[in-house]
């Protein structure tokens, strides 16, 4: 019979398990010896006792720090309960299940309290996330300087049409167009960890231009339509103004293919490594647009660059096909679960040609980084980068591949903390729930970065999800439409990706038997 263990001595509980018994963390069975190893590579009871006490005290201190930015004192208790509920095991992390698990003797009253707190209370999401950032980033930076600011968006499939921002659009979770909500976020990362520091729902044009829908969902009156790259640039400008430690901007082709986004980053004096489409127009190395046509003495002189039938750019795909065999190098960028992560890459210094016929000067030289796995018939990924001209191919690859950190953020936030489980329809509740999920996530990260996990444990046991059937990364060629995969939003699709971290959080563990955390395959990028 399953028994929920809350607030008990973690060490005694683990030591009471037999070899055949499992401890379920986040819905997955973990052997007692594995938990002990995750806690610090040792089963010493004294160390685990101390850690449990410290983690409980750390949670109280963390919540107390957050309370200072949410206004009324009567919001302190629902804040703590909401975060506590998100950290506890459970298939659903919507308001009603959170009420049941945090106040089983008064579920109805707790439900009303949490519902008001997340859906209606006018506290600031930006202030809460700012306090989380100020608490967590110093702990992350103990493991190394911030290397990257990572932009991405994540989708939440929906069946109805009344939830704020829902529309038929690209859904990253499904890898295709579907009915969903999409939020844009900015994470800061080093090699050890990452943290989302900005989050905003993308409001499609059909919503932005519909006063009735906006009113029902209580969309802020001053909010106007912005594209996802425009939202991302706004988040980046805000982070700059807040004095966040700078990093290279990383983004996929959904952002990198937007010339305005790249130009905006350059105007902000930020370097980037961003995905682009194979159709990107580029000049061959050493080439560029023709200078303005000489003035004939009649009419107004022109200052615009030009092309000719004999002098014109080519696509990134065509340039890749023309590269010599010795231009390609096999680069290893990270240690995977079972093998090193490696592929073939080429890097070329060139000028993008994007609409340069409307410019008075050519684009500056950048790196075009191309990935062509040996088992593929053609290159699979392309990036543009403004990293310095003396950067090496391994440096370019290592930086580009750090974007996996934001995918890990989304994976943990969705599968472990219920990021996609909010059932309300309004703007405020959508953002409040996400901010609280990020706050809970920040607490887990702060514990991990305070007591570093075993490197060998991480390398051998951290898992990531397999991709759903029909998944197509944004920017990839469009294959024949695949049937829509069946996704159960109530059940995680993979094992806990940060087992060591979860086991060290608090003594909120569930005794039982479940799927092995080593049963799924590691997703790499």
Regions found by a protein language model. Give the residues of each.
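Hydrophobic, well-ordered secondary-structure elements that form the walls
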Residues: 407, 439
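Conserved nucleotidyltransferase catalytic core and NTase-mimicking acidic/glycine-rich helix/loop elements
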Residues: 443-477
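Short, solvent-exposed helix-loop connector elements
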Residues: 260, 385, 393-400, 415-432, ...
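A detector of single, family-specific signature residues
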Residues: 1-29
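Active-site-adjacent bridging/hinge elements
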Residues: 161, 410-417
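An anionic, glycine-rich sequence signature occurring as long contiguous blocks
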Residues: 192-224, 273, 277, 282-405, ...
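Intrinsically disordered, low-structural-confidence terminal and linker regions
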Residues: 30-36
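Conserved, well-structured functional cores that handle cations and Mg-NTP chemistry
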Residues: 46-250, 254-274, 278-281, 288, ...
């Amino acid at each position: 019979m399953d028994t929920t263990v809350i607030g008990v001595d973690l060490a005694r509980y683990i030591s009471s398990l037999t070899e055949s018994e499992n401890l379920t963390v986040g819905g997955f069975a973990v052997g007692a010896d594995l938990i002990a190893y995750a806690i610090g590579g040792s089963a010493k009871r004294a160390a685990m006792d101390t850690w449990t006490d410290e983690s409980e005290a750390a949670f109280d201190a963390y919540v107390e720090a957050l309370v200072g930015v949410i206004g009324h004192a009567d919001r302190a208790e629902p804040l703590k309960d909401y975060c506590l509920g998100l950290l506890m095991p459970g298939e659903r992390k919507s308001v009603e299940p959170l009420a049941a698990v945090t106040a089983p003797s008064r579920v109805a009253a707790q439900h009303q309290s949490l519902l008001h707190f997340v859906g209606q209370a006018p506290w600031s999401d930006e202030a809460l996330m700012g306090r989380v950032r100020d608490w967590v980033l110093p702990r992350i930076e103990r493991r190394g300087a911030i290397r990257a600011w990572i932009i991405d968006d994540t989708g939440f499939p929906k069946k109805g049409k009344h939830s704020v921002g829902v529309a038929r659009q690209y859904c990253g979770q499904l890898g295709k167009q579907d009915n969903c909500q999409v939020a844009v976020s900015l994470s800061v990362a080093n090699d050890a960890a990452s943290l989302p520091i900005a989050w905003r729902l993308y409001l499609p044009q059909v919503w932005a231009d519909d006063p009735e829908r906006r009113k029902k969902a209580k969309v802020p009156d001053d909010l106007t339509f912005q594209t996802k790259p425009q939202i991302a640039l706004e988040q980046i400008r805000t982070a700059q103004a807040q004095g966040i430690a700078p990093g290279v901007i990383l983004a996929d082709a959904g952002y990198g293919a937007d010339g305005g986004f790249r130009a905006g980053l350059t105007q902000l004096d930020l370097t980037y490594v961003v995905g682009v489409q194979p159709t990107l127009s580029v000049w061959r190395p050493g080439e560029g647009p023709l200078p303005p046509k000489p003035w004939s003495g009649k009419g107004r002189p022109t200052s615009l660059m030009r092309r000719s039938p004999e002098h014109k750019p080519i696509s990134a795909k065509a340039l890749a096909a023309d590269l010599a065999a010795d231009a390609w190098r096999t680069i290893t960028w990270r240690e995977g679960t079972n093998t090193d992560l490696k592929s073939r890459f080429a890097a070329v210094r060139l000028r993008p040609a994007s609409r340069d016929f409307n410019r008075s000067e050519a684009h500056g030289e950048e790196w075009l980084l191309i990935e062509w796995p040996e088992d593929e018939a053609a290159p699979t990924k392309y990036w543009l980068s403004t990293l310095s001209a003396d950067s090496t191919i391994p440096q370019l690859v290592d930086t580009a591949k750090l974007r996996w950190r934001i995918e890990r953020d989304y994976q943990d936030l969705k599968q472990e903390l219920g990021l996609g489980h909010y059932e309300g329809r309004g703007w405020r509740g959508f953002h409040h729930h996400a901010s609280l999920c990020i706050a809970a996530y920040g607490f887990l990260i702060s514990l991990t970065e305070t007591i570093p996990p075993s490197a060998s444990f991480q390398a051998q046991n951290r898992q990531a999800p397999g991709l759903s059937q029909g998944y197509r990364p944004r920017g990839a060629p469009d294959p024949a439409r695949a049937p829509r995969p069946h996704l159960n939003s109530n059940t995680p699709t993979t094992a806990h990706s940060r087992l060591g971290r979860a086991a060290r959080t608090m003594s909120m563990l569930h005794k039982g038997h479940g799927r092995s955390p080593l049963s799924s395959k590691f997703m790499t990028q």
